[in-house]
Amino acid sequence: MGGDFQRRLVLLFGLLSLPCAAEPPGIWLDVPFVKQERNGCGAASVAMVMQYWQRQRGKVADASSDARQVQRALYAKKAHGIYASDLGRYLEQHGFRTFAFHGEWSDLSQHLENGRPLIVALKPDANSVALHYVVVAGIDAKRSLVFVNDPAERKLREHEWSDFRREWNATDDWTLLAVPREGASSAP
């Protein structure tokens, strides 16, 4: 009986010493995950970034950062989603400064190192005009990985850099940075 207990104890300590796979290596931010509704990836991505900044400032998420509200405010039937320019406009109206640009790996690294998640547009299907917005929440340069909060799937979805780059390049590497405007009363 004593030997059985010792084997279990050794096994337990052995398991506890294994590296934890819950957190990806490299740089990553704990951006809240918001699941999208139909054609709601843009709204969910805006909500994730707004909620991230509200949490950073110790505030509770408010109605403006609710994905359903963003979707109601911005959804365009013709686009079957939200236009990129409207994402930035909504964030501006709610206390953020926004910067849309053609991103590169160095931009992902720089902004994540400074605690700033990015919204990017991807084009998963080259034969479709549909875009898909995700939030870049982490990278691992050593393993050439990008981690995104994909509102259609899950938090910290792993992409090989080459696959991510192909889908991102199809949108001309569209990237949106949103940072709280200092002193804005409606800023999170």
Please state what every model-predicted region is.
Residues 2-6, 18-80, 84, 105, ...:
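Active-site-adjacent structural segments surrounding the nucleophilic cysteine of cysteine proteases
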Residues 9-12:
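N-terminal export leaders
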Residues 23, 89-92, 167-169:
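Short, conserved catalytic or adaptor-binding loops enriched in Gly and charged residues
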Residues 26, 79, 113, 117, ...:
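Noncatalytic regulatory segments and standalone regulatory/sensor domains
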Residues 70-105, 109-118:
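Mid-length scaffold segments of soluble, non-membrane domains
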Residues 97-149:
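Active-site-adjacent substructure of cysteine-protease-like catalytic cores
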